[in-house]
A protein has these predicted regions:
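Conserved NTP-binding catalytic cores of kinases and kinase-like/nucleotidyltransferase enzymes
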Residues: 1-110, 249-257
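Generic recognition of stable, solvent-exposed alpha-helical segments in well-folded globular domains
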Residues: 77, 140, 144-147, 236, ...
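ATP-dependent phospho-/nucleotidyl transfer catalytic cores
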Residues: 125-151, 157-238, 249-252, 365
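Short helix/strand-bridging catalytic loops that position acidic/His residues to coordinate divalent metals
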Residues: 128-137, 259-264, 280-284
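ATP-binding pocket architecture of kinase catalytic cores
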Residues: 60-80, 84-167
Length: 365
């Protein structure tokens, strides 16, 4: 296992030269200097790097790199996943190639050193646009995001490397005991939410959440246990899959769409990511405009099938989407209890609740 890079000060020309040689990127020559361009990030130290090479370095060495360094074990699963990816042939094309990654379980520090694609790619929408209620990408970029997500899911669909590998099923779904522990946590979280913010919600919304909390204990046996026990129709999920996590190509004829920031990667139903992508910050009007939601789900499903996914019907997808809406409609409650602003969690709650109702999720309880 490579040594962990714990700070940007550690990123010296000598270190990068060693990393490049170890990974077969620099057969001759060396790195003479490194130019740093810091990149503000929520929970990591990140920077764009420009190596300066000696004249005898190969012509095809990477011109720009991106590094992120995380503390408190936040990067553990991301490093494990990317290292798993590097062993796959061919590697999944929607993931930015990793050059080097390491995690120290004693200190909780990790790093990922990757190719920098910021010169050829851009985010389809900004966080500011999403929070302003303008989170729908341009049609071509939306299609690219859906295709990239379907590609990720199809690649890892019931993949043998996920059964006993480093990417794991989320704790609440590993067994009944942990599921019921999560139910108790959500029940207590809802109780605190009602006390601090419930007064501003309409009665019918309170009833919707109360009914969900009451039904949660029954969902394990009815919908979840057999799926997780049999590893049925599972894949690698991003699990924080907002549009800000995608990077769309400036020139689609040359490059494809990437998914980034795999910090929350897990083994789950693919609909987990679809709910984040479609239902979390799109209003009812945005989902229904020109059947946008249905078109996205249809495109996703058809892409799965084209990529070889079998024994998964359209009805299966719709059922999973409804099930994940039931699970994720709790997100804004968690957000409010963990310090998110009112504007943030209220917008998310309205979007998720509208989708929950439109898909008649209460009938599954």
């Amino acid at each position: 296992m490579p040594d962990v890079i714990s700070s940007l000060d550690s990123v010296t020309p000598e270190l990068l030269t060693s990393i490049f040689r170890r990974n077969g990127l620099l057969g001759q020559g060396r790195i003479l200097d490194v130019k740093f361009h810091p990149n503000p990030a929520f929970n990591s130290v990140a920077a764009h790097l420009e190596p300066v090479y000696s004249e005898d370095a190969p012509a095809d060495v990477p011109e720009r790199l991106f590094i992120k360094i995380k503390q408190n074990h936040w990067g553990r699963d991301e490093v494990a996943f990317y290292r798993l990816v590097t062993g796959q042939k061919p590697p999944p094309s929607m993931l930015i190639p990793l050059i080097d990654g390491a995690y120290d379980k004693e200190t909780g520090v990790s790093h990922c050193l990757m190719l920098d694609v910021s010169g050829t790619h851009h985010a389809p929408v900004s966080r500011e646009r999403i929070l302003a209620g303008d989170g729908v990408p341009e049609e071509e970029e939306l299609a690219g995001c859906v295709d990239a997500l379907a590609g990720l899911h199809a690649y890892w669909w019931e993949h043998s490397a996920l059964r006993d590998g480093p990417v794991r099923i989320p704790p609440p779904f590993r067994d009944e005991e942990r599921y019921m522990t999560e139910v108790r946590c959500q029940t207590e979280e809802w109780r605190r939410f009602r006390k601090t913010a419930g007064g501003e919600l309409p009665r019918e919304l309170i009833k919707l959440y109360e009914r969900r909390i009451e039904a949660l204990p029954t969902l394990w046996d009815r919908y979840l246990k057999h799926r997780f026990d049999c590893f049925s129709q599972f894949t690698a999920c991003h699990s924080d899959c907002y549009f800000t996590q995608f990077l769309c190509p400036d020139d689609p004829e040359v490059h494809g769409t990437y998914l980034s920031d795999m910090e929350e990667v897990c083994v789950c139903l693919g609909a987990e990511d679809l709910v984040y992508l479609i239902a979390t910050f799109w209003t009812r009007e945005q989902r229904q405009e020109n059947d946008r939601e249905t078109r996205c789900l249809t495109r996703y499903y058809e892409s799965l099938v084209k990529r070889g996914v079998k024994n998964y019907s359209w009805d299966d997808l719709c059922g999973d989407y409804r099930l994940q809406l039931i699970w994720r409609v709790e997100l804004p409650v968690w957000d409010q209890q963990n310090g998110s602003t009112r504007d943030y969690w209220r917008l998310k709650m309205q979007c998720l609740v509208d989708a929950y109702r439109d898909w008649d999720c209460a009938t599954l309880l």
